[in-house]
Amino acid sequence: MAGPRLPENCRPVDLEDGWQVQQEVSRRLALTIGGWKAALPGPGKLVVAPIYAPGISQQAAVLTRPGVDSVKVEPEIAYVVARDLPARAQAYSEQEVDAAVGSVHAALEICASRYLSLADLPFPELLADGLVNDGLWLGPALAATEAPAFELSWQIEGEPVQQAQARHPNGQPRAPLYWLANFLRERGLGLLAGQTVITGSYAGVLELPLQRRVRFDYGGLARFELSFAAARQP
C-alpha cells in the first residue's frame, strides 16, 4: 500500500541515510532477500536495493499489488548467483564475480512505490523506498551471451507489435554486478547463492495492461509470454 512521505524529522538527508533507512525496512519486514537491483553510482545517486524473495516470480501469470489497473515494468537482464561472494577484506575481481554467476536470464522488474507521489522527492528518499522495486519476473535463460544493445519487441494481445532499440544504461551489462559485489562486500553483506541481480533497464519503463497476454522478444536472446493480474484485496 502507498502512503505519504516520512515525517520531516525522519526523512533521509543524504545517500547514507537513505541506505540505512532501506536496510532498517528490510530488517523490520524480515523477508528473505532474493536478489538485488543495482546500477553504477553517479553524482548524488546510489542505485542499490533489495528484491524480496516473495516478490520474485517465474510463473506465466503474475500477480501485482491489489487495486491497480496496469503494471509498470522495466526490461532487464538478470544474473542468478550460483556461488556465495561473502564479505571479505579483499576486493572481488571481475573474473571471480563471473565465476559465481550460474545463469543469465531475461527479466522484467516490476515497479511501484510506497509513496503516494514521487513528484519532487529527493533521491535519498527514493533510495530509502527501495528505488520503486516491487518485484521481479525471472524469465528464460538467454540463448547467447548478453549484449549491451538489441532490438526489443513486445506485443500486447490484440494490438500491433511495438519495437525499441534497447540499450543498457551503463553500456556493459555486468558492470553494475561487479560494483554491487564489492559494495555489499564492504558493507559486510555479500551476495549469496540463489540470489538474482538486475543491473538496469534496457528500455525505460513500459506500462502494460492487466488480464492481457504480452509477448516479448529480446532480439532473439530470449522470447517469452506472460500476463499480469491484480491480487485480491486482503
Question: Can you describe what each PLM-predicted range is?
Answer:
Residues 216:
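Carbohydrate-binding surfaces in secreted/extracellular proteins
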Residues 176-209:
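A conserved acidic, glycine/proline-rich C-terminal tail/linker
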Residues 1-172, 177, 186, 207-209, ...:
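Catalytic-core "active-site belt" of small-molecule-metabolizing enzymes
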Residues 156-158, 199, 219:
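Short strand-turn-strand beta-turns centered on an Asx-Gly dipeptide
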Residues 233-234:
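Non-transmembrane, aqueous-exposed alpha-helical and coiled segments at domain scale
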